[in-house]
Amino acid sequence: MAKVSSIKKNESRKKKSQSLHNKRSALKSKIYDKNISLEERFSLVMSLAQLPRNSSSTRIRNRCELTGRPRGVTRKFGISRNKLRELIGRGLVPGVIKSSW
């Protein structure tokens, strides 16, 4: 089980990222617009830098929903490989069966 503080930190990053997503994407689209003067684009870059670091979506870590494990998390299920294997073995994941050949 992961530390509760690291799980809470990741949750707060998700909330900040969602709340500032529109502002951040609008600034980025204006920064990459070549029709705007260089001085204005530089001021937009500075305003983007003033936003909190944790509002960036790249700082969010995919964690297991059951254990909080940060590595080996499947995108489809949102569960770590260990728990997924355990649940599939018990037959608790619908539509997934253990293969045998």
Curated annotation (Swiss-Prot):
Q: Where is the signal peptide?
A: none
Keyword Disulfide bond applies? no
Family annotation (InterPro entries): Ribosomal_uS14, Ribosomal_uS14_bac/plastid, Ribosomal_uS14_CS
One example GO MF annotation: structural constituent of ribosome
Q: Where is this region: Disordered?
A: 1-26
Q: Which GO terms describe its cellular component?
A: cytoplasm; small ribosomal subunit
Report keywords, A-Z: Ribonucleoprotein, Ribosomal protein, RNA-binding, rRNA-binding
Gene Ontology terms describing biological process: translation
- Record's keyword annotation contains Repressor: no
Looking at the record's lineage, which domain of life comes first?
Answer: Bacteria
Residue ranges annotated as compositionally biased, kind Basic residues, are: 11-26
Under PROSITE patterns, the record lists: RIBOSOMAL_S14
Q: Which residues cross the membrane?
A: none
> Member of which family?
Belongs to the universal ribosomal protein uS14 family.
Assembly with partners or alone: Part of the 30S ribosomal subunit. Contacts proteins S3 and S10.
**What exactly does this protein do?**
Binds 16S rRNA, required for the assembly of 30S particles and may also be responsible for determining the conformation of the 16S rRNA at the A site.
Q: What is this protein called?
A: Small ribosomal subunit protein uS14
Gene (name only): rpsN
